Structures are given as C-alpha cells and as structure tokens.
C-alpha cells in the first residue's frame, strides 16, 4: 500500500524471554471515530490530508495477512461517533466494516455509549470480534454476556493474554447512557487480570487501553507504574500520535512499551515483537 495514502508506524520490540526465539506481528488502531472515507486531500496538514479510510485499511490488512497469516489486529476503542454515518446508522456501518477486518480483540471507548446501552448491545451482538474490558462491572445488563474481561489467543506457538481497560464514565458519558454499569479502578483490575493470565501460563500479556496517555485521571502510565506483569500497552482515547513507542517503568523496574496512533486511523501501528530465547 502506498505510503501517501495510509501510513504504518513500525517498531521492533524485544518484549519477553521465551523458550525459543519467536516473532509476533501486531497491528493496532485506535479512535477511528467513524472515519469511513479518507480525510480531505485539501487539509493544510499534509501529514493528515488524504490519509486513512476503511477500504484502504481492509486492502492493507489483506496484504499484511498474505505475508504473515499469524499477525494480530487490535483496536483500542472509540470506533464510534464522528460522521453522519454514525449519526444515521448508529454504528452498523462501523461494526460491519470492522467485521471485514477480522479484529482479534477490541476494547470499549466512551463514545461507544453515545446511543445508550440498548444500542451497544445491538452492535456488540453483530460484532464478529471479541470485546474486552476488565474494569467495568456489567452486572444487570445484557453486556455482561457480551463483554469479556480478557481473552487468550494462540499464535506461532505463543499463548497471549489480552485484556481491556476503559475510562471513568462520569463526566464523559451521560448517566442515562450507561445506567447501572460500574467503573472500577483500572490499576487494581489490571493486576488482578494479569495474575490470572500468569496463572494460565500466558507467554505474553497485552493491555488494550482506552485510558489515554499523559492525561488527567488514571492513564496508561499510571497503570504500568502501579502493576507488574504487563508486557505491552496498546493505547487510545487521548488521540496521541506516538512516532515511536513510549516506555514506562513497572513495579519490577521493567520498561513497558506503549503505542498510540492519533485518531481517524490515518496511521496503523505495526509492532514486531522479538521473543528472545531464555538462557
């Protein structure tokens, strides 16, 4: 795919020690905000003009999967809200296109609540991808059966635990739109899930986060600094363009990488994880 229509940010990252040398490719989007078509070619910012678009991403993914069928694809939330398509069809277009992209897991952004719980349930039932969120309590809603705290994937002989974190709803979402859903501390929830995934012998633990980078409230930095055992954070919410991975020290002193790709999917993050053989 030509770089003048869709950019892929690329990082090679040595993440964890494993029984033998292995590599794992991850593609990551966040905050696509219903950007169905490419951005206007007339934008003054040439780094954004004529970028992105679902059709281009679908074509790019087809090419990437042809080269590497074992790659993983994740989204960090807020695929909703931002165009007349969302206003008119309430997420059907976005979820339908994401189904064609075959995401391995997606977490929840605050804008997924914009048309209320009933609409979220309707959309999540249509999704052919897992939706993960570990720090919302969905008891008393249909979402309890549709959203998992984590999933475990297997790729290239690796066991990969993936969990989601989402932001505090109060102040971001109208109370009527999230009803009885309870927000729980992301740091405590993250450590609880990591411990479960470690007990299940996961080789790699990935957090898909919609908490945000360098913002008020609990951020990706705070989650990493307050936990141990996370290997990688794929972020969203703050619309931050990270040209390279940012690193935060966890409780064990390990430097943990964080990726985020702005908004509207004009960038798709690509990470190649080099799993080094244990000595």
Q: Model segments located where?
A:
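Bacterial Sec-dependent N-terminal signal peptides
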Residues: 1-23
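Acidic, metal/ion-coordinating pockets
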Residues: 19-279
